[in-house]
């Protein structure tokens, strides 16, 4: 028996609500897990994984979920208010990422090790630089009068697409970090696989949200 369009819509909305709630919990849980594992303050390096997971797992995920019609924690507020909260969270994520990057550079300097010698380090640097550009681009959406020649709809589309790329870069950096000697020495077996699933799950949720809000809608328009 075929489901009606209305029933399918309700099911789809319920699935998106459930996946959004899962993304909130996973982003927070993964960050707490890394913090417990790293024990921030025990060494200079210990702050690096904590700050990077806080930036790319928790803050950036929450910033993007801010616009989810089903799972935004502030969906009762106006889009203008949510946009400003989004920008604040993105800025905090950038600051945490910059601090985390700076501390690991200092740590390697103290040990006399080469900088950006691994795929993880290179992906992390690219993700931080992209986040900086993304935050700068967000100013144009907060104050569209600064870019009068650009249609606001196109600015939103470009910003959303670029933001998705930046988020995936951050998630890639986290995934590569979980292949590092430090992480694999402390997390093994099933726990490692569960940890790897965390940024993959949140990335899928964010990809679905952005695709439905901007990319898919733009494709079906004549």
From Swiss-Prot:
Residues 39-46, 107-122, 184-186 are lumenal. Residues 14-217 form the Cytochrome b561 domain. Keywords: Cytoplasmic vesicle, Electron transport, Endoplasmic reticulum, Heme, Iron, Membrane, Metal-binding, Translocase, Transmembrane, Transmembrane helix, Transport. CDD domains: Cyt_b561_CYB561D2_like. Its cofactor is heme b. Heme b 1 binds at residues 48, 120. It catalyses: monodehydro-L-ascorbate radical(out) + L-ascorbate(in) = monodehydro-L-ascorbate radical(in) + L-ascorbate(out); Fe(3+)(out) + L-ascorbate(in) = monodehydro-L-ascorbate radical(in) + Fe(2+)(out) + H(+). It is a multi-pass membrane protein. One of its GO terms (molecular function) is transmembrane monodehydroascorbate reductase activity. Its EC number is 7.2.1.3. GO terms for biological process: ascorbate homeostasis. Binds 2 heme b groups non-covalently. Residues 2-17, 68-85, 144-162, 208-222 are cytoplasmic. The chain crosses the membrane at residues 18-38, 47-67, 86-106, 123-143, 163-183, 187-207. Pfam families: Cytochrom_B561. Transmembrane reductase that may use ascorbate as an electron donor in the cytoplasm and transfer electrons across endoplasmic reticulum membranes to reduce monodehydro-L-ascorbate radical and iron cations Fe(3+) in the lumen of that compartment. This is Transmembrane reductase CYB561D2. The gene is Cyb561d2.
């Amino acid at each position: 028996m075929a489901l009606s369009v209305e029933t399918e819509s309700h099911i789809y909305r319920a699935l998106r609500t459930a996946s959004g709630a899962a993304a909130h919990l996973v982003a927070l849980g993964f960050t707490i897990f890394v913090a417990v594992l790293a024990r921030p303050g025990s060494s200079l390096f210990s702050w690096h994984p904590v700050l990077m997971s806080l930036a790319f797992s928790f803050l950036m995920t929450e910033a993007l979920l801010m616009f989810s019609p089903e799972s935004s924690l502030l969906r009762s507020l106006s889009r203008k208010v949510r946009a400003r909260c989004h920008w604040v969270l993105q800025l905090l994520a950038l600051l945490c990422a910059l601090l985390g990057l700076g501390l690991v550079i200092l740590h390697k300097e103290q040990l006399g090790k080469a900088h950006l010698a691994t795929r993880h380090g290179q992906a992390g640097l690219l993700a931080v630089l992209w986040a900086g550009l993304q935050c700068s681009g967000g100013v144009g959406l907060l104050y569209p009068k600064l870019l009068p020649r650009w249609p606001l709809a196109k600015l939103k589309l470009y910003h959303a697409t670029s933001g998705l790329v930046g988020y995936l870069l951050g998630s890639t950096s986290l995934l590569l970090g979980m292949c590092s000697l430090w992480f694999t020495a402390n997390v093994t077996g099933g726990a490692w696989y569960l940890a790897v699933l965390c940024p993959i799950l949140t990335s899928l949720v964010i990809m679905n949200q952005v695709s439905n809000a901007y990319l898919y809608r733009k494709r079906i328009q004549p």
